[in-house]
Amino acid sequence: DHLFFRGRYDYRELLREISGRLSTLLSLPQIKEMLIGSIAGALQVEKVILVIMEKGRFRLYGEGLGRQGEEPPGEIGLLIRILEREKRPITVAAAAKRLAGREDRERLAGLFKQLGVMLVIPLPAREGVAGMIALGQKRSGELFVDEDLELLSTIANQAATAIENAQSYEALEALNRDL
């Protein structure tokens, strides 16, 4: 695969490919599928979950989930609030440090465990967070490095814009159908 270089991905090439594909997609299902597949393949992670705000509610998408589009556990609100404050990728350990109460830390750790993820990257919105990309451990067992986090943050920013555009386009199509 041309996105890998000696067992690792080519950061610039992957970013160029994902950016190009995101700029041409107007279908939310296609965007979700492309993001999940590209990130899972390039970073060789065990799991990729997208959490996206749709019609006022967060929804889960990814491989290995029971149903696509189901609502996440209630503890997701804790994590969203942390991401709104931090505005950057955050691990389960770092997220727990942001919480004062032991009960909240345990609930958050339980959420990460239930989802099978160890890193979350916010999808920024005009106001707050429109969702997140949640990643499981790398298959190699390696930790995420700064280059990974920079890449994921850039992808998340572009993905948030593409998702917002697709949602606006779908709303416009629905309005035109109803006329």
Language model segments and positions:
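Amphipathic coiled-coil signal-transmission "stalk" helices
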Residues: 7, 11, 25, 161, ...
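Helix-loop-beta substructure at the N-terminus of cytosolic sensory domains
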Residues: 11, 24-61
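GAF sensory/regulatory domain recognition
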Residues: 48-88
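Short beta-strand-to-loop transition segments that serve as allosteric relay/switch motifs
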Residues: 63-68, 108, 132-142, 148
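A short, aliphatic-rich beta-strand micro-motif
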Residues: 79, 116-124, 133
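Signal-transducing coupling segments at domain and membrane junctions
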Residues: 95-117
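Flexible loop/coil segments at beta-strand boundaries within sensory signal-transduction domains
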Residues: 111, 123-129, 138-139
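Allosteric cytosolic regulatory segments
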Residues: 149, 153-160
